[in-house]
Amino acid sequence: MAAAIDSSTTPLSQQYDTPLGLGHSTMQALKDRIKLHYDLASDYYLSLWGEHIHHGYWENDSQTKEEAQVNLIQLLLRISKVGENSTVLDVGCGIGGTSRYLASTLGCTVTGITISTKQVEIANRLTKAEAAKDQEKNEVEPDADGFVKLGRGKVRFIELDAEKMGDFFAGLGGSFDAVWISEALSHFPNKALFFENTFKVLRPGGKLALADWFKAENLSETDFNNDIKPIEDGMLLPPMCTQQGYVDLAKQGGLSLLDGPKDISKDVARTWDITWSLIQNPSLWAFAFSQGRDGIAFLQSFRAMRRGYANGTFQYAVISFEKPGGN
């Protein structure tokens, strides 16, 4: 039985209400819409969530949103055993918050990739500002390979469709110690290809740290239509997978399960309660309206996310994998 949850409609959300649950026309068209969405909305993401565009993981009720977001990174580090001074490929890096954290805190050499031109621009700007402050300089410039020194590590950002990462990094010969992907794989039309490419770019013994959104197993048609389809529509997602679906695809791609899946839905759901309260700003809804249906559907899908968590139909989990052959 579906749990009762306040839909929390407001005068703003009612004013801009739009039906959700439409299917996507083609996967290429969906990818184009995803790129456009992040190019247009990333400045708003920064204002809403800060530099970490992902869920928070609350270990206790007193923690702030920002502390909870760092908690999620630390949880992924624990289950994946990604160590200090690792070479990391951060797939779907957003505006670079995790990449900078891994570089400055663990001394990692991090390459962040995103399909969004705007996100690369913002990530570079934030990284240079942090590096200049860290080095007590007015300005810093990247090295010949595009890396900016940050703490004990360094980081760079590349605009790249993640489905092409296997070929793009082929010349490196599987040189990454870790691949990191947080809340990005759910956007990918070809998830099997991601795991195959991860196998290609990892060195033997390399780790994959993964956090993502999932649909629950064995959903009724009613639950799927009420809870999952609106999320797929508003969040620009191809058909969602189950947690076991990712495990199966990873194994088919040559990876071994290291830890998980660990369902942390109850510990992250608060993210959307906070977010719903943050978006009650007329200018944000007006901006979304100016972007057409996708902009409004995105904001309206926040309610579906909250409902899905409450009903147990929508889940959040972390998983880690390993490429066989390490010492």
PLM features: residue spans?
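N-terminal auxiliary segments of SAM/dcSAM-dependent transferases
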Residues: 2-47
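Conserved alpha-helix/loop element of class I SAM-dependent methyltransferases that forms part
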Residues: 52, 59, 63-86
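Class I SAM-dependent methyltransferase SAM/SAH-binding core
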Residues: 87-89, 98-164
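Conserved SAM/SAH-binding loop
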Residues: 95
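A short acidic, Gly/Pro-enriched loop at the edge of an enzyme's catalytic core
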Residues: 164-179
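A short glycine-rich, Lys/Arg-flanked "PGG" loop and its adjoining helix->strand segment in the class I
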Residues: 192-207
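Acidic carboxylate diad motif detector
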Residues: 210-212
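Substrate-binding/catalytic lobe of Class I Rossmann-like enzymes that use SAM or dcSAM, i.e.
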Residues: 221-316, 322-325
